[in-house]
Amino acid sequence: LSTALGYIDAQYKRFVTNIAGVPTDVADFRRVQNTPKWTASGTLAYSAPVGDGDISFGTTLSYRSKTNQFEIPNPYIDQKGFALWDASLVYTAPEGRWSLGVFGKNLTDKHYKTSGYTFINVNPVTGVPILGTNGLPTSALGTEGTLTAFYGNPRTVSATLELRF
């Protein structure tokens, strides 16, 4: 059994940017990117003899709190807190000559963002997206705005066969 817990209170004391030519401290409206306040994980591993071989089981649950992709919060690409569950089962033959394993990652098939890009207009102080008459964010790159999110891997299950000679 192993556990880990992480906490970081990352924030800007000052974040000065020029708004209409005037140096303005916008620290209250900025976030340290890719820095969750909380992270946690717990792993349970068990191994037992089976005949002359060995069987091992492991499972891990990990958590990451809300993450901002950029200094300016963006409701479209920032990631809310989420948990991932992984597990494995491995049989190892006598004397370690071979092993057979099954591994699962993101077993709940959680959809989560790992990064993203945004080229939409925002209020320079608060970072709130500026919406057009159609209710959609207005573009910072001409006629088309770009808002792209990249997602983590979906549920994956794999098997391994290892031979030692």
Feature roles, as predicted:
Residues 1-71, 160-164:
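Gram-negative outer-membrane beta-barrel transporters
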Residues 36-40, 81-85, 153-157:
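Residues that define the transmembrane beta-barrel architecture of outer-membrane proteins
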Residues 40-42, 87-89, 124-126:
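Feature captures outer-membrane beta-barrel proteins of Gram-negative bacteria and organelles
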Residues 44, 86, 96-99:
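Mobile, glycine-rich extracellular loop/lid and propeptide segments
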Residues 57, 86-87:
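Amphipathic alpha-helical protein-interaction segments enriched in hydrophobic
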